[in-house]
C-alpha cells in the first residue's frame, strides 16, 4: 500500500481506500491510520453510522469541496451531485456520533483483536487435535474458516496469513456444502455462525470465545463422524 501511494503521487492519480469493513476496526483510524498512509478519498459505512443505515466519504479538502453548495448558482449547477437516501438522517448521525466516540479509544480495537486471536487459535487447535483438514485465519478482529483445505503453517496457533495456499482458496473459502453443514452444526450447538467466518467486537468476552470453540469442536467431530471430510468437497 505504501508503494501504491508513492505510485499514485508520482502519476497524479487519486488513491481511494475502501474502509467499509476495516475503518475503525483495524485501528481508530482504520488501515490508513495503522500503516500511516493518507489516501485521497476514503469510503466508510457500518460503524460510521453506529449500526444504522448510512455511509460516508471523506478525503482531501480540495476534493471534498467539489461537493459543497455555495452562494453561486453557476457553481451549484456544475458541482458534483451527492444524492443519498440517508443524507442528513438525524437518527443515523446521532448513532454514528455515539459509536465513533466509543471506537476512538484504541482499547476497543485491542480487545476485539485479542478475542479474534483467541478464537482463531482455539479453532486451529481443534482442527489439529482431531486431524481435520482446514485452517482458520485472519487479521485484526476478523476470522475466516477454510475447511477441507490445508496450509503449511497450520500448527494449532493463530494464523494471520496462511502459507502454501492458492489465492483462489483464500478468496472462495470452503465449499458451499461444507459451509452450509458447518453453519447448521453450529446452530445446533447454539452458535449462529456467519457462513465462512465472521467479525469480533468489544462486546465479546473470553467466555463467549471459549464456548464458541467448544461448540466448533463438537460440530466438527460430528461432521467427521458423518464422513464430511472423507473426500474433497
Describe every region a protein language model picked out.
Residues 1-233:
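Conserved N-terminal phosphate-binding loop of PLP-dependent enzymes in the Aspartate aminotransferase
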Amino acid at each position: 500500500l505504501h508503494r501504491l501511494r508513492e505510485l499514485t503521487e508520482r502519476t497524479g492519480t487519486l488513491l481511494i481506500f475502501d474502509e467499509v469493513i476495516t475503518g475503525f476496526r483495524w485501528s481508530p483510524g482504520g488501515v490508513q491510520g495503522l500503516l500511516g498512509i493518507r489516501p485521497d478519498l476514503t469510503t466508510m459505512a457500518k460503524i460510521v453510522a453506529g449500526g444504522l443505515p448510512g455511509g460516508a466519504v471523506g478525503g482531501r479538502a480540495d476534493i471534498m469541496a467539489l461537493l459543497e453548495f455555495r452562494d453561486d448558482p453557476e457553481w451549484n449547477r456544475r458541482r458534483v451531485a451527492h444524492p443519498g437516501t440517508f443524507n442528513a438522517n438525524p437518527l443515523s448521525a446521532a448513532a454514528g456520533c455515539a459509536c465513533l466516540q466509543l471506537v476512538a479509544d484504541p482499547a476497543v480495537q485491542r480487545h476485539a483483536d485479542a478475542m479474534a486471536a483467541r478464537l482463531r487459535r482455539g479453532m486451529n487447535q481443534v482442527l489439529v487435535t482431531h486431524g481435520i483438514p482446514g485452517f482458520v485465519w485472519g487479521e485484526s478482529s476478523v476470522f475466516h474458516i477454510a475447511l477441507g483445505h490445508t496450509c503449511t503453517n497450520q500448527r494449532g496457533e493463530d494464523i494471520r496469513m496462511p502459507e502454501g495456499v492458492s489465492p483462489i482458496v483464500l478468496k472462495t473459502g470452503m465449499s458451499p456444502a461444507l459451509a452450509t453443514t458447518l453453519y447448521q452444526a453450529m446452530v445446533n450447538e447454539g452458535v449462529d455462525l456467519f457462513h465462512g467466518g465472521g467479525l469480533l467486537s468489544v462486546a465479546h468476552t473470553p467466555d463467549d470465545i471459549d464456548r464458541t470453540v467448544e461448540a466448533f469442536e463438537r460440530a466438527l467431530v460430528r461432521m467427521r463422524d458423518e464422513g464430511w471430510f472423507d473426500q474433497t468437497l
